[in-house]
């Protein structure tokens, strides 16, 4: 599946069409108050573009939180409708459900050019296909799922997906539309453009930077990237498993992943066969407890980490080594911070690496930050707009980097 050959919103004739946009309005709420409207703001370019092309109406649909297939006011999209209305400077009609005769009647009766936001898709078990009852998974019937998908499809002539964060889920609103044209919105298109370039046609040298605690969780990721990259930096907690297995470094009480340890030699063998340079930290900031105010010191890998101490960040020599590796690269994909950046004492390694990739991006290289923790780092230090691309989807970007096909992307029409 090529990521760069999918139909775009710009390929569509939208005049007088009934347009359905699957957006990602899964915003953080404090009661009924939205604490960050970033996801709503991110969807505006696609919504505005569609409105400028005079559709019959625009129907927006999203999930919010995990209501587990039933109505729960806590997860209502009503506050989002208000926020969207003020951001768009245009009336937004909020409907109390996402399917059913009342929804169909309200949509049909809407004025030309209306913007309609449906209630949370996940109030219906048919969106995800199952729900948890007393810890057990209960599946929706095939007939009910088909009916739900048919009801959503019947609201539209054209389907646009702009929810990259959910693209790795084969949910009804992602793969259930029986419509001839299924296109990517601007947000999704940008994700596909950057990941497509890196994974299908990178400017070399291509560097992957990986963090995270467990090797076992990242096996598929490392294995797939070894087929594509020229070098790989391994930081974070999983570096200790590599150091212990490969160099017999004393790692004290640092994270050691037994299951992952068995795979390390295989991964290194593959790296060697493919000519991929694997860069590991050579010194550590260690702590006598996993806490923000622990005692700290710096040790080299030769000295090792004493019992009762654990590594929570890479040290100054590692930072220099990583900086030199970043400086050589023309394409960089970063997934996972190298240290416990949430604690100020152990954030320096992450901050130093961030400074280097910002520099690389400023020099015109392609730098992609996978969603999740690494995106949080970019946001924390206010550099999101100084990086070529910060992904909006943690799980979805990880699955792309693992070489998996995303159902929500595979479902889109191909460009003619």
Curated annotation (Swiss-Prot):
<keyword id="KW-0547">Nucleotide-binding</keyword>
<feature type="binding site">
    <location>
        <position position="65"/>
    </location>
    <ligand>
        <name>(2R)-3-phosphoglycerate</name>
    </ligand>
</feature>
<feature type="modified residue" description="Phosphoserine">
    <location>
        <position position="318"/>
    </location>
</feature>
<feature type="binding site">
    <location>
        <position position="168"/>
    </location>
    <ligand>
        <name>(2R)-3-phosphoglycerate</name>
    </ligand>
</feature>
<feature type="binding site">
    <location>
        <position position="213"/>
    </location>
    <ligand>
        <name>Mg(2+)</name>
    </ligand>
</feature>
<feature type="modified residue" description="Phosphothreonine">
    <location>
        <position position="392"/>
    </location>
</feature>
<keyword id="KW-0496">Mitochondrion</keyword>
<feature type="binding site">
    <location>
        <position position="236"/>
    </location>
    <ligand>
        <name>CDP</name>
    </ligand>
</feature>
<protein>
    <recommendedName>
        <fullName>Phosphoglycerate kinase</fullName>
        <ecNumber>2.7.2.3</ecNumber>
    </recommendedName>
</protein>
<feature type="binding site">
    <location>
        <position position="213"/>
    </location>
    <ligand>
        <name>ATP</name>
    </ligand>
</feature>
<dbReference type="GO" id="GO:0005829">
    <property type="term" value="C:cytosol"/>
</dbReference>
<feature type="binding site">
    <location>
        <position position="237"/>
    </location>
    <ligand>
        <name>AMP</name>
    </ligand>
</feature>
<keyword id="KW-0418">Kinase</keyword>
<keyword id="KW-0479">Metal-binding</keyword>
<feature type="modified residue" description="Phosphothreonine">
    <location>
        <position position="93"/>
    </location>
</feature>
<feature type="binding site">
    <location>
        <position position="373"/>
    </location>
    <ligand>
        <name>Mg(2+)</name>
    </ligand>
</feature>
<feature type="modified residue" description="Phosphothreonine">
    <location>
        <position position="331"/>
    </location>
</feature>
<feature type="binding site">
    <location>
        <position position="311"/>
    </location>
    <ligand>
        <name>AMP</name>
    </ligand>
</feature>
<feature type="modified residue" description="Phosphothreonine">
    <location>
        <position position="241"/>
    </location>
</feature>
<feature type="binding site">
    <location>
        <position position="63"/>
    </location>
    <ligand>
        <name>(2R)-3-phosphoglycerate</name>
    </ligand>
</feature>
<dbReference type="InterPro" id="IPR001576">
    <property type="entry name" value="Phosphoglycerate_kinase"/>
</dbReference>
<feature type="binding site">
    <location>
        <position position="217"/>
    </location>
    <ligand>
        <name>Mg(2+)</name>
    </ligand>
</feature>
<feature type="modified residue" description="Phosphothreonine">
    <location>
        <position position="298"/>
    </location>
</feature>
<dbReference type="InterPro" id="IPR036043">
    <property type="entry name" value="Phosphoglycerate_kinase_sf"/>
</dbReference>
<feature type="cross-link" description="Glycyl lysine isopeptide (Lys-Gly) (interchain with G-Cter in ubiquitin)">
    <location>
        <position position="274"/>
    </location>
</feature>
<feature type="binding site">
    <location>
        <position position="218"/>
    </location>
    <ligand>
        <name>ATP</name>
    </ligand>
</feature>
<feature type="modified residue" description="Phosphoserine">
    <location>
        <position position="172"/>
    </location>
</feature>
<feature type="binding site">
    <location>
        <position position="24"/>
    </location>
    <ligand>
        <name>(2R)-3-phosphoglycerate</name>
    </ligand>
</feature>
<feature type="binding site">
    <location>
        <position position="38"/>
    </location>
    <ligand>
        <name>(2R)-3-phosphoglycerate</name>
    </ligand>
</feature>
<feature type="binding site">
    <location>
        <position position="312"/>
    </location>
    <ligand>
        <name>ATP</name>
    </ligand>
</feature>
<feature type="binding site">
    <location>
        <position position="122"/>
    </location>
    <ligand>
        <name>(2R)-3-phosphoglycerate</name>
    </ligand>
</feature>
<keyword id="KW-0963">Cytoplasm</keyword>
<feature type="binding site">
    <location>
        <position position="121"/>
    </location>
    <ligand>
        <name>(2R)-3-phosphoglycerate</name>
    </ligand>
</feature>
<dbReference type="GO" id="GO:0006094">
    <property type="term" value="P:gluconeogenesis"/>
</dbReference>
<keyword id="KW-0007">Acetylation</keyword>
<feature type="binding site">
    <location>
        <position position="23"/>
    </location>
    <ligand>
        <name>(2R)-3-phosphoglycerate</name>
    </ligand>
</feature>
<feature type="binding site">
    <location>
        <position position="342"/>
    </location>
    <ligand>
        <name>AMP</name>
    </ligand>
</feature>
<feature type="modified residue" description="Phosphoserine">
    <location>
        <position position="130"/>
    </location>
</feature>
<keyword id="KW-0808">Transferase</keyword>
<feature type="cross-link" description="Glycyl lysine isopeptide (Lys-Gly) (interchain with G-Cter in ubiquitin)">
    <location>
        <position position="258"/>
    </location>
</feature>
<dbReference type="InterPro" id="IPR015911">
    <property type="entry name" value="Phosphoglycerate_kinase_CS"/>
</dbReference>
<feature type="cross-link" description="Glycyl lysine isopeptide (Lys-Gly) (interchain with G-Cter in ubiquitin)">
    <location>
        <position position="82"/>
    </location>
</feature>
